From Swiss-Prot:
Residues 1-22 form the signal peptide. The keyword Repeat does not apply. It is found in: Periplasm. It holds the Pfam family SBP_bac_3. GO terms for molecular function: aspartate binding; glutamate binding. This is Glutamate/aspartate import solute-binding protein. The keyword rRNA processing does not apply. GO terms for biological process: amino acid transport; L-aspartate import across plasma membrane; L-aspartate transmembrane transport; L-glutamate import across plasma membrane; L-glutamate transmembrane transport. Coiled coil: none annotated. GO terms for cellular component: ATP-binding cassette (ABC) transporter complex, substrate-binding subunit-containing; extracellular region; membrane; outer membrane-bounded periplasmic space. Gene3D superfamilies: Periplasmic binding protein-like II. Belongs to the bacterial solute-binding protein 3 family.
Amino acid sequence: MQLRKPATAILALALSAGLAQADDAAPAAGSTLDKIAKNGVIVVGHRESSVPFSYYDNQQKVVGYSQDYSNAIVEAVKKKLNKPDLQVKLIPITSQNRIPLLQNGTFDFECGSTTNNVERQKQAAFSDTIFVVGTRLLTKKGGDIKDFANLKDKAVVVTSGTTSEVLLNKLNEEQKMNMRIISAKDHGDSFRTLESGRAVAFMMDDALLAGERAKAKKPDNWEIVGKPQSQEAYGCMLRKDDPQFKKLMDDTIAQVQTSGEAEKWFDKWFKNPIPPKNLNMNFELSDEMKALFKEPNDKALN
């Protein structure tokens, strides 16, 4: 997929949302907040096609469940720095480049569909969890694929640079399944590989699979199957060793979740018609998500 907008040309006004009171201390030298204050701009990473978390709608506006969190964090930064007119730049990122671009300072944080796990914590820091998912399979309805055991000797697609790619390769090696694993650039490319018949199944986080199904020409032709191979926690990603910025992000997320606002966002993006095709994902709030909204935390689940 080609980037539809240059990274430096996308400007967005962050939407207002319920905000937590941030730490009143001045930004620490060298911190993300200090960088933002000095430059007069906050640079936010986003995904292009992670429906319904972070993606372009029909007007090329970045929208989604995770983007609502991102907007709330931007508003909290404006309040913290007393800069209501702070410039906001949005840049598109992928599963492959999100960590390097964060580390080299290209963007300040991102809320998308990034799993917080122990391995990634060596490279980046994560906010409180914003979503909990399970990794499953999207396949043609009524076909032969009902669970992961049916993938033996079959072609399976997965998005490159994701934890699902790691899991699928591990499963293939440990179970001697002789799968032909296709690594696609992004979730949209993964689904097109499935849709074209080049793969019999697409392995990914269940909520993202529901998003790809909702975008399909004929959503009813596809079903999500299989016992979850892992449970994963999505968090907003920021640079390591920046406790002040992490606290601002965590406080904002906790306020949104405990106030009931996050559940409204969930209903908006997972239980109602959404762009670009006004299709309903019909994805119910899980017990894990209900528990998260009651007690926000930043625990990695794997």
